[in-house]
Amino acid sequence: MPSGRLLARTMAQYVVVDSNAPVVELGPGTGAITNALIERGIDQKRLVLVEYNPGFCALLRDRYPHAKVVQGDAYRLRDSLREALDAPASAVVSGLPLVTKPMQIRLKLIRDAFVALAPGAPFVQFT
């Protein structure tokens, strides 16, 4: 489900700009939230975009050539981030429709996201 600009900007407000730590985005799709993160001042080089759809991955690589685009499954986040994340993330931002998944799958994704995060860093989710 595509994100509106206002929602994307609201989500981006929770991400710290003055950091060098990576920002992980789950399910970026066509980049609505990604754009909001960049407009907020997040350097593309900090972005780790985890996208399942190969077509969206190609689009994201074209639109954000300095971001790290990972074709992977956010619901298998540890595997998807294994080689992509070189430091604890300053934020995980998710546009995934979590409520459509069974509770155990949702909880696993959230646990894995917190493992990837630096202490005190936000997990930002809308559903």
Predicted regions and their residues:
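Conserved beta-strand signature within the Rossmann-like core of class I S-adenosyl-L-methionine
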Residues: 117-127
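S-adenosyl-L-methionine
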Residues: 1-18, 57-86
